[in-house]
Structure formats: C-alpha cells, structure tokens
C-alpha cells in the first residue's frame, strides 16, 4: 500500500513565495520516507489540492496524508482543509485521506524562533 504525503501551502501570486513549498517537497522526496510526495496550494497558485491529489492517486496512492504547511490551525486548516479532505474522500472512495496538524505549535518551532531572533540582533 503506497502512502502519499501532500504538503499544502496557502499559495501566493509571487513565485518566490511559493518556492518554499517546492523546496520542502524536493527535500522530502530525497528523504524517501513516503513513496509519493507532492505539493499543492490552497489558493492563488497551482497545482491545486485537487490536481496534486490526482497526481498522488495516479501514482498508486492508497492513502494520502494532507499536511498543512501552515503555522497555526486557523480557518484554512480547521474549516477549508477539513472540507476539502471530506470532498476528496467522497470523490476517491478507494483512497484513505487524513489531515495532519499544521507545523506549529511544536517544540522545534521554538528553537527556530530563537535562532531567527538571534540572527536579527
């Protein structure tokens, strides 16, 4: 059974802002923890979540982990992505979809905050 990791960022009209997600996707592919790794944007950019899900399914994913590349569990995560997960499950009944927690709060995030603050001083 192949498990896909689908990283989801908000999306931006600026390519350089979207590049962060593409870099993470590339690094996750190199690690090899998941058979399939794709990236998608909630809005303003492509690929959409639906398009990236199609890529996962066409590569044989039986399970797709939707991982919000967001810092907090706001409206986009709790409402929008939850609704999208439900729609994807309905549209792809042979595939299991799970929605992971966003990046923060996580103990490692505190270390990044400290590091960034020190770099700025």
Regions found by a protein language model. Name each.
Residues 1-121:
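Active-site-proximal alpha-helix that buttresses catalytic centers in soluble enzyme cores
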């Amino acid at each position: 059974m192949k498990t896909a990791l689908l990283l989801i960022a908000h999306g931006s009209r600026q390519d350089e802002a979207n590049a962060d997600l593409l870099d993470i996707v590339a690094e996750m592919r190199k690690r090899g923890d998941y058979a399939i790794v794709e990236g998608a944007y909630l809005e303003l950019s492509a690929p959409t979540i639906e398009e990236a899900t199609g890529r996962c399914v066409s590569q044989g994913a039986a399970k797709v982990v939707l991982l919000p590349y967001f810092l907090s569990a706001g409206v986009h995560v709790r409402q929008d992505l939850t609704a999208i997960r439900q729609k994807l499950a309905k549209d792809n009944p042979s595939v299991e979809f799970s929605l992971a927690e966003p990046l923060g709060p996580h103990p490692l995030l505190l270390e990044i905050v400290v590091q960034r603050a020190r770099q700025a001083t």
